[in-house]
Swiss-Prot record:
Family: Belongs to the dUTPase family.
EC number(s) reported in the record: 3.6.1.23
CDD domains the UniProt entry points to: trimeric_dUTPase (cd07557)
NCBIfam families, A to Z: dut (TIGR00576), PRK00601.1 (NF001862)
GO molecular function, one term: magnesium ion binding
Gene name of the record: dut
Organism in which the protein naturally occurs: Rhizorhabdus wittichii (strain DSM 6014 / CCUG 31198 / JCM 15750 / NBRC 105917 / EY 4224 / RW1)
Pathway linked to the protein: Pyrimidine metabolism; dUMP biosynthesis; dUMP from dCTP (dUTP route): step 2/2
Cofactor(s) needed: Mg(2+)
Entry-linked HAMAP family: dUTPase_bact
Residues where substrate binds: R69, S70, G71, N82, T86, I87, D88, K96
Protein name: Deoxyuridine 5'-triphosphate nucleotidohydrolase
The entry's keywords: Hydrolase, Magnesium, Metal-binding, Nucleotide metabolism
């Protein structure tokens, strides 16, 4: 069963001319591939907010998550920081992807190269209720590997 498709408005910026719009690579892909609108070289250990050449208007009640591409991470040590990054429904600036080179060699990002995936997701709002005590659980305060490696 698939979720209903939502419509996201996209404004192409001047430096995004000629680039493909975000698109699914396969029929069952969860993320839309997004490409770079600029050439940039990432030195080992460097990071850069890579331009995509577009801005979007996400419907209220949704966000768009920015996620890394597994091939870039495995083959080159290049990944997205702040993952998943969240693009809020009220943001109207250019979508940028924070890439980091965790590898040992410089990595060249070419204009038009796929750099990340965008995954639209419904947002569940919450309100915190301050209490004096929390209910007990078997796990308790254990975290950061307390349930295994």
């Amino acid at each position: 069963m698939s979720s209903p498709e939502i419509s996201i408005k996209l404004k192409r910026l001047d430096h995004g001319a000629g680039l493909p719009l975000p698109a699914y690579a396969t029929a069952h892909a969860a993320g839309l591939d997004v490409v770079s609108a600029e050439d940039v070289t990432l030195a080992p250990g460097a990071r850069h907010a890579v331009a995509t050449g577009f801005a979007i208007a996400i419907p209220e009640g949704y966000e768009v998550q920015v996620r890394p591409r597994s091939g870039l991470a495995l083959k080159h040590g290049v990944t997205c920081l702040n993952t998943p990054g969240t693009i809020d429904a009220d943001y109207r600036g250019e979508v940028k992807v924070i890439l980091a080179n965790l590898g040992s060699e410089p990595f060249e990002v070419k204009r038009g190269e796929r750099i990340a995936q965008l995954v639209p997701a419904a947002v569940q709002r919450a309100a915190f209720a301050e209490v004096s005590d929390l209910d007990e659980t078997a796990r308790g305060a254990g975290g950061f590997g307390s349930t295994g490696r």
